[in-house]
Amino acid sequence: MTKHIPNTITCLNLLSGCVAVILALSGCYWGVVACVALSAVFDFCDGLAARLLHAYSPMGKELDSLADLVSFGLVPALMLYTLLREYLPQECTWVAYVALLIPIFAALRLAKFNIDDSQATTFKGLPVPANAIWWLGACRLLMDSASGDATLWLSVAAVPVLCYLMVCNLPMFSLKFASLAWKGNELRFLLIILSVALLVWQGIAGCAAIIGLYVVLSILSARGAKN
């Protein structure tokens, strides 16, 4: 019976993502934020449950990726699409379809992850959940500036950048703690501390800066490892 617990939690991730899809199409931003946050909790808990219960399975791995594709790939894409359709000039609304690149590259990222055993402790490219977190912050900024042309077009330009980051081979450190000791976890603790500060300062909009910081710290860590 216990072997089904991780997959059940993964299905809750998927369910939360499906609700977020409906809310995104309805323009309910805070509902989307709540559902994506809930999906992230379930995404963490299914892996934790699998480790504690020794309930790993090939099916669980594939199911987890399918759930992540919806919750962290499709949801931010629909949220961005809805906002771009609302705020772009009438003659430019077709540009909103660029948001659909997000789930395509998220699918490529997840497929790549599933066949690459070297990503157990570190990642290659931006994890799909991190992509979703970035877009939560970016969409909040977009809503706050609404008619600001600069923010609109920066959001559009950010799509191919984030898509590239998901599928590139840039080494990204994992946020999984082997222990709570400072040594060996310096970057993780630093990211957590700065993330809390950014959220207090900027609210949900700070999510974009947090993921930007994560990318920068990963680049610095990779360069340090080479030296």
Residue ranges and their predicted role:
Residues 1-47, 199, 221-227:
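Topogenic membrane-insertion module of multi-pass membrane proteins
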Residues 123-227:
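C-terminal membrane-associated helical module and adjoining short loops/tails
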Residues 19-34, 74-100, 138-155, 200-205:
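Helix-coil boundary and interhelical linker segments in multi-pass alpha-helical membrane proteins
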Residues 45-52, 108-114, 168-172, 219-227:
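Juxtamembrane membrane-interface segments at transmembrane alpha-helix termini
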Residues 6-11, 52-111:
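Multi-pass membrane catalytic core of lipid/isoprenoid biosynthesis enzymes
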Residues 13, 17-23, 75-78, 106-109, ...:
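Helical transmembrane-bundle signal
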Residues 9, 32-39, 98-105, 131, ...:
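Hydrophobic alpha-helical transmembrane segments of polytopic
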Residues 55-58, 89-90, 114-121, 143-150:
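Membrane-interface helix caps and helix-loop-helix hairpins in membrane proteins
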